[in-house]
């Protein structure tokens, strides 16, 4: 038993380290660039590096920083306003159509930001519906366009975190505030925000990391954020050195955000003496206020999901590519790729979760899960460049021509990127299996394999399926990794939709986009249903 446990421990740690290796490939490239400055054996390469870096820092670097800061701050503010306000209304008040709107407000998660971007450009363009009806157009090809698209796409993260906190935390504080006859505004600012600020902070950090990772919306709307800049340097300017530096800076910034999150969660604890299974009783608003609350939430849902979805369906019906073989070939390729990725990722996540559970060492368990989950925190563009840098380095050393098998590398990158999603999905299932179950099983039949296959797997089957579905959909939606690492001639739905939109072929882009949205929509609705069942049980 002890010998077997040792194998699980070693295997899990080696797997976690192996999965994090490509993430640090970019830092190896940075050290190589630094080394070349002190190497006099290859003057031509040194001159090329210095020329590229000089152009990068003189003309591009400050613009990338400026655009990234403007977009990040703008998206964060817009997401906070929309997410917190709508969450507070849903958690505390009864008003017209609130149950329907509560579901609609999470549905923007089903539409990737890059799809939302070209839908709004199509609506607001000179030949679009908005210009024909109102006689003027709104220009989306600027910072404001990116902020609107990302803000309306990402606010559900804050909405979900905040709504749960508003519903269940600081019930006693709410009751005391009512007894003291606090106004609704004062209850919101003095009680609700205070009790939910930890949850709001977590949602805001997630929005910030998703903003930094975004490539499609920023690139399509012509704003040079870090992720869009990485592509611009790598493909348009053929400057791998500057692209590596920008990727490294972006990774360092993300690590800083992760540290801030860790520090905040460990240093700021707020204790409210309450029964967490209780929820705040909703209050009924006056007739006028009900109309205003309903209208406000409907406008958010309209802009974030209803309007874009209707337009995608309308454009999709006008497109005759539904009857062309190419659409089905690309769809089949994408689904098979997503299926393979989801299957491998789910199995690896299951092994890591099982190993961290039976090791019974908090330090090793934390190391295994944190290292394995690191890939999700890294922007996809930076991860893609890091993968190329690493495998080019391995090709030079071992002469394996690994880049010739770039489809395998693409799947490997997907696994690194989405392993955290699978781990978090399985974590919820393992939290429901009591440790006494493991001890009883091992006492009766001292075998970890029996525990794994006969005990945990039947209990975890629904969570394994959930993890599989989430990774499957994330893979279909992924754009930057697919653009960077997909082999020549191999296209996914996301890449095809982006290329059509970039060529201003909106009707052609609608069909692959609609398929992505419909698949994502099924998962979002299903996950919301599972969450509601858990709330009822609690």
What are these regions, as identified by a protein language model?
Residues 242-243, 441, 509-510:
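Solenoid-repeat scaffolds in large eukaryotic assemblies
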Residues 54-64, 136-139, 232-242, 322-333, ...:
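Membrane-interface segments at the starts/ends of alpha-helical transmembrane spans
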Residues 46-57, 313, 317-323:
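A short amphipathic helical element positioned immediately N-terminal to and/or at the very start
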Residues 4-41, 57-167, 195-215, 247-262, ...:
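Membrane-water interface segments at the C-terminal ends of transmembrane alpha-helices
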Residues 264-296:
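Flexible interhelical linker loops that connect adjacent transmembrane helices
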Residues 270-282, 437, 530-538:
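Short cytosolic juxtamembrane segments of multi-pass membrane proteins
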Residues 93, 166-196, 223, 359, ...:
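Short helix-to-coil transition segments within interhelical loops
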Residues 212-238, 477-506:
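Glycine-rich helix-loop "coupling/hinge" segments at transmembrane-helix boundaries
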């Amino acid at each position: 038993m002890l010998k077997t446990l040792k194998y699980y421990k070693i295997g899990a740690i080696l797997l976690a380290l192996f999965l994090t290796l490509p993430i640090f490939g970019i830092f190896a490239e940075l050290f190589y660039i630094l080394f070349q400055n002190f190497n006099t054996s290859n003057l031509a390469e040194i001159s090329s590096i210095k020329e590229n870096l000089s152009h990068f820092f003189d003309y591009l670097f400050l613009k990338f920083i400026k655009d990234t800061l403007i977009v990040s701050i703008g998206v964060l503010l817009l997401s906070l306003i929309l997410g917190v306000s709508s969450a507070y209304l849903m958690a505390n008040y009864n008003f017209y159509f609130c149950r329907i709107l509560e579901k609609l407000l999470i549905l923007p998660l089903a539409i990737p930001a890059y799809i939302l971007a070209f839908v709004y450009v199509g609506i607001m363009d000179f030949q679009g519906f908005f210009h024909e009806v109102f006689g003027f157009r709104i220009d989306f090809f600027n910072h404001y366009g990116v902020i609107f698209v990302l803000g309306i796409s990402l606010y559900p993260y804050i909405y979900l975190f905040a709504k749960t906190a508003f519903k269940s935390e600081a019930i006693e504080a709410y009751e005391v505030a009512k007894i003291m006859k606090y106004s609704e505004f004062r209850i919101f600012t003095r009680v609700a925000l205070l009790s939910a600020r930890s949850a709001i902070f977590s949602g805001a950090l997630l929005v910030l990391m998703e903003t930094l990772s975004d490539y499609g919306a920023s690139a399509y709307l012509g704003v040079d954020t870090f992720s869009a800049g990485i592509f611009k340097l790598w493909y348009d300017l053929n400057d791998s050195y500057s692209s590596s530096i920008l990727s490294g800076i972006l990774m360092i910034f993300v690590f800083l955000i992760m540290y801030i999150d860790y520090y905040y969660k460990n240093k700021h604890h707020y204790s409210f003496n309450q029964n967490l299974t209780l929820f705040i009783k909703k209050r009924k608003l006056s007739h006028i206020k009900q109309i205003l609350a309903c209208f406000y939430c409907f406008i958010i849902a309209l802009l974030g999901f209803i309007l874009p979805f209707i337009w995608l369906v309308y454009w999709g019906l006008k497109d005759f590519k539904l009857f062309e073989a190419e659409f089905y070939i690309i769809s089949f390729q994408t689904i098979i790729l997503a299926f393979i990725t989801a299957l491998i990722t789910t199995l690896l996540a299951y092994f890591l979760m099982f190993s961290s559970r039976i090791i019974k060492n908090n330090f090793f368990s934390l190391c295994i899960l944190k290292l394995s989950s690191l890939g999700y925190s890294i922007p996809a563009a930076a991860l893609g460049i890091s993968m190329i840098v690493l495998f080019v380095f391995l090709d030079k050393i071992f002469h394996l021509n690994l880049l010739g098998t770039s489809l395998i590398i693409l799947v490997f990158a997907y696994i690194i990127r989405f392993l955290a999603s699978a781990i978090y999905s399985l974590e919820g299932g393992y939290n429901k299996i009591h440790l006494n179950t493991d001890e009883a099983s091992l006492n009766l039949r001292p075998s970890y394999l029996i525990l794994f296959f006969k005990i945990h797997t039947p209990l975890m089957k629904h969570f394994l399926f959930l993890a599989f579905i989430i990774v499957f959909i994330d893979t279909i939606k992924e754009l930057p990794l697919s653009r960077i690492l997909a082999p020549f001639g191999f296209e996914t739905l996301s890449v095809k939709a982006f290329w059509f939109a970039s060529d201003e072929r909106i009707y052609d882009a609608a069909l692959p986009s609609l398929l992505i949205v419909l698949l994502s929509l099924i998962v979002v609705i299903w996950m919301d249903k599972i969450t509601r069942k858990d709330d009822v049980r609690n």
